[in-house]
Amino acid sequence: LERLLESLVPGIDVTNEPQRQSCGAPDYVVSRNVIPLGFIEAKNINDDDLEGKKTTGNKEQFVRYRSALNNLIITDYLNFHFYDNGELMTKVCIGTVENGVIVPDNEGIKTFELLFSEFCNYVGQTIKSPQKLALMMAGKAKLLANIINNALISDEENQQNSSLREQMLAFKEILIHDIKPAELADVYAQTITYGL
């Protein structure tokens, strides 16, 4: 997927970040000159919950991503859902699986090329009100808190001594003795988000 997307729009970089996947980060970051333009969350081919409607499916993750990431694609590698500021703008299918073989949809591929080019030309919106800023920052803080919480839980389960886990232990020892990973994650996320 990385090579395909980079070949469609010269000058962009598509980075897959598998080390952050367990923490809840989107699978791909699309950037130009190290500036993120958008994000892509990829699921398995023929995933039956690309819309994130099933509570036992992708719902919680997709809601979190749509509220925090302004320019987002959710895909199963054949179907691509384009979101702008949390709203589904359009969908396109570039192929189907028939008898275990992927059959390309040439019209869908042409449409996808145009849509992905537009996706890469995304310009962030100007914030014109304190309410809009507060909503955007809150969404980003929630996403960050979830990522930090998942990282802390992963470190604990795998008995890894990351700097984040060490900070959690120091926090417990010095400041709040009964703090839980989710609470520390919330404190960190708010400090990072609103401390900027």
What are these regions (language model features)?
Residues 15-21, 133:
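Short, solvent-exposed loop/turn elements at beta->coil junctions and helix N-caps
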